[in-house]
Amino acid sequence: MKFLRLLLVPFALVVVLASRLGLPIRFGRIWSDRMGHMAGNMECYLCERKAGLSQGWDFWFHGAEPCNKQLALMLSRVVRIDPTPFTRICAMVNRLFAGWQKHEIDTLQVDRDVANLFDKYPPQLSFTPEEIAHGETQLARMGIPEGAKWVCLIVRDAAKHPHLPYHSYRNADIAAHAPAALALAERGYYVVRMGKDVLHPMPIKHPRIIDFAMQYDDFMAVYLGAHEVTSAACVYFR
């Protein structure tokens, strides 16, 4: 594989040189190992592109194995994502030349909508009719009836990225959020505890409280978040 990548370097050099000759070619790395960044950064980029703030012949590559296959699929419908190592190599070769920043895709402020474009444009990612039908079927299987409203409970768990201890201050105990979940459930909302890697199950039982983290699915992680009433998450103070 390493030898194959070396063989691609001359071709990458041709592409990079072409970009210096006037072709508006740009390369971008998708922050694929973090769902928030994978969705947020790309939504900012797509809205900025729609507003005319980001222009070029843009080619993307995944910076890591996508943390959510459904989200990766939806992104592949609206941006060019190279599944081969070639675009990554082009991005590396690009950085060897002065003025490389001009040929690297960026947003105004990473994953912050500083231009308030989210208020101006609808979500740039969408589900197909077949995916919507599948999502509604899965909701019924989870016990959420048609027309019901749900709140996604997002509590960062110590099982998330245990190899990054400097982020441990962001972790919280799901048990501390149980009273809030119960209060919402008693008001008629369904509460869906989100998450992919968790240490403990939801400590309370209620017909309208669903511990999705214990039955995680890539597709429903996106579908639930896209159709929720709101999210209940942790807020951090310094």
Q: Where in the sequence are the language-model features?
A:
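N-terminal targeting/anchoring "stem" of glycan-biosynthesis enzymes
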Residues: 1-238
